[in-house]
UniProtKB/Swiss-Prot annotation:
Side Lumenal, residues: 29-431
One GO biological process term: cell wall mannoprotein biosynthetic process
Domain of life (superkingdom): Eukaryota
Annotated S-S bridges: none
Name this protein carries in UniProt: Glycolipid 2-alpha-mannosyltransferase 1
Length: 431
């Protein structure tokens, strides 16, 4: 009898195991990591774009320049002024109004997203694109330019093309923009990389990182594929947008005469830029005419320009005017830095280079901090700390993770120097 009961239990256990195996097989099939069939799931705007029914300016329409793009009403209450200036501040408030029921292609300006990526970045980049489209670009259908030092493959082009609601364009970086200039001693550069590896300096050992920083500093804006645009928004893989942007952010930049905008700022690793400031001072001494009146020298230097405090705008999020990078002042500044060799003999990043240039060559009123966007790039978060702002912008971020008012952030200094009013409740997020 005991043997019969044991056999029965074994049979029941065997049946149960078969059921579990079957369920596991079904779940595995349902959660396959194979790429989705974008041809079947792409948006109508993307489909029309791929079939040639979208106007040259991008967006969903009948193909005429004045085609209308239907848009829904802004959701939730509207903050009166998210970026209002405090006493003495000169910054214009970001308008928080309903988008019209229709938004014509003629309302758009000459602007594009710009992404530097490799084919291997595809699916981490796809998440970034989804964030930007859902939070902003599905309303405005701006173009997206992708740059690579190698050819993009068909999978990359087809996948991003199905996600972007505007036109997608792909540019191959010229060899001379992604290689050593003739005056660089490559043996010396290799020795520096090895020394930085031993010191465990972040990206200090990387050759490709240096080419990337030099490219973003001096060549991305020279790409012929960008000649048709006046403004850009830099987007990288693995970023997140946490809040709705219900106004045309490019048009706002133009209408308010802004040339550079950021969401996060912090000090640079001093070990990567030991001579960057001295090299900058050499340039300024020879070219004082390029210093802007009412510049932000006091943001990048605590001693009236003697030394650099390391503060820089985090360049993985940039919205800016391409005219600034194309200007004589910036071109000559980059050429001076490039000849000095610090991109390879040290590890100069594009973020401090861009930031120093913007701080010195632009009036401070042309630089803007977007505190209503909600942005993440590992490991830092920008999240509006004012609860009413988060509700109005439909943000899904945790204000306790906001970096803006922390002691290590340079944005607090930016607010203080400009005498800007801070967000309601900021004091609770400083620790």
């Amino acid at each position: 009898m005991a043997s019969t009961r044991s056999n029965a239990r074994l049979i029941r256990f065997g049946i149960f195991a078969l059921v579990l195996i079957g369920c596991g097989y079904i779940l595995t099939r349902g959660s396959s990591f194979q790429p989705p069939n974008y041809q079947q799931t792409q948006s109508p705007a993307a489909h029309e774009k791929q079939t040639g029914n979208v106007a040259a300016g991008g967006g969903a329409g009948s193909g005429s320049a004045g085609a209308q793009v239907p848009l829904g009403k802004n959701r939730g209450p509207i903050p009166k002024a998210i970026m209002g200036a405090g006493e003495g501040g000169s910054d214009a408030p970001v308008p928080q109004q309903d988008i019209p029921d229709s938004y014509t292609l003629n309302d758009k300006i000459k602007a594009t997203f710009v992404t530097l990526a490799r084919n291997s970045d595809l699916y981490s980049l796809a998440e970034s694109i989804r964030h930007v489209e859902d939070r902003f670009n599905k309303k405005f259908h701006y173009d997206w330019v992708f740059l690579n030092d190698e050819e993009f493959n068909d999978e990359f082009k087809e996948t991003v093309g199905s996600l972007v609601s505007g036109n997608t364009k792909f540019g191959l970086i010229p060899k001379e923009h992604w290689s050593y200039p003739p005056w660089i001693d490559q043996e010396k550069a290799a020795l520096v990389r090895e020394q930085m590896r031993e010191k465990k300096i972040i990206y200090g050992h990387s050759e490709s990182y240096r080419h990337m920083c030099r490219f973003e500093s001096g060549f991305f804006w020279r790409q012929e594929i960008l000649n048709d645009y006046d403004y850009y928004w830099r987007v990288e893989p693995d970023i997140k947008l946490y809040c709705d942007i219900d106004y045309d952010i490019f048009k706002w930049m133009k209408d308010n005469n802004k040339d550079y905008a950021f969401t996060i700022s912090l000090p640079e690793y001093k070990e990567t830029i030991p001579t960057l400031w001295d090299t900058t001072k050499e340039f300024i001494e020879k070219n004082p005419q390029y210093l802007a009146q009412n510049n932000l020298m006091d943001w990048v230097s605590d001693d009236k320009g003697q030394t650099y405090n390391g503060c820089h705008f985090w360049s993985n999020f940039e919205i800016g005017s391409l005219a600034f990078w194309r200007s004589e002042a910036y071109r000559k500044y980059f050429e001076h830095l490039d000849k000095a060799g610090g991109f390879f003999y040290e590890r100069w990043g594009d973020a401090p280079v861009h930031s120093i240039a913007a701080a010195l060559f632009l009036p401070r009123e042309k630089i803007h901090f977007f505190e209503d966007v909600g942005y993440y790039h590992v490991p830092f978060t920008n999240c509006p700390v004012d609860k009413e702002v988060r509700k109005a912008r439909n943000c899904n971020c945790d204000p306790n993770k906001d970096f803006t008012w922390r002691g290590y952030s340079c944005t607090t200094k930016y607010y203080t120097l400009n005498n800007f009013k801070r967000q309601k409740g900021w004091e609770k997020y400083t620790a």
